[in-house]
From Swiss-Prot:
Superkingdom assignment: Bacteria
Family membership noted in the UniProt record: Belongs to the cytochrome c family. PsbV subfamily.
Protein name: Cytochrome c-550-like protein
Gene it is expressed from: psbV2
Membrane topology label: Peripheral membrane protein
Cofactor: how and how many bound: Binds 1 heme c group covalently per subunit.
Sequence positions that bind heme c: C83, C86, H87, C137
Cofactor(s) the protein needs: heme c
PROSITE patterns, alphabetized: CYTC
Annotated GO MF terms: electron transfer activity; heme binding; metal ion binding
Classification via InterPro entries: Cyt_c-like_dom (IPR009056), Cyt_c-like_dom_sf (IPR036909), Cytochrom_C550 (IPR029490)
Amino acid sequence: MPHLDQKLPMRWRIPSRLWAWVGILALLWLGLASPVAARIDPYVNQYLRVSGPVELPLDAAGHTLTFTPEQLTDGKNRFQSACLNCHVGGATLPAPNISLSLKDLRGATPPRDTLQALMEYQRDPRSYDGSDSSYGCRPVPPSWMDDEAVNYPAPTAKRYGAGFQ
């Protein structure tokens, strides 16, 4: 059986091969690009305004950590499963006048405006003025979540709070 190009006039032989290569490249591009895009939650792009790596303050000394949109998506998912019951829409149900805004996080005693401070708070929740244990927020002991698991929601909450300065 003759090849398809042998039936076509000479001027059509190159374009048919070109279209075949364009089709193959398009399929490869779609196959490689879509899994990456699927891992980033649209919420992270739209509301946290993250499309690439972002630096967030780690501690009071000014050290920072860099997070990818994928890491923030994972943090958002963990926040939804562990924190959303009390922090719907950035509010704090036990104390509605205190939100997750950076202004409110900075005003806490001790301040909770760095990743390290938020992670410490998750291990030992204190009242806003730091005087007593917070009965509205349950502590997250290492037996429930290891340090890595506890650390994931903090960057998402921190980035969320940055939108409400």
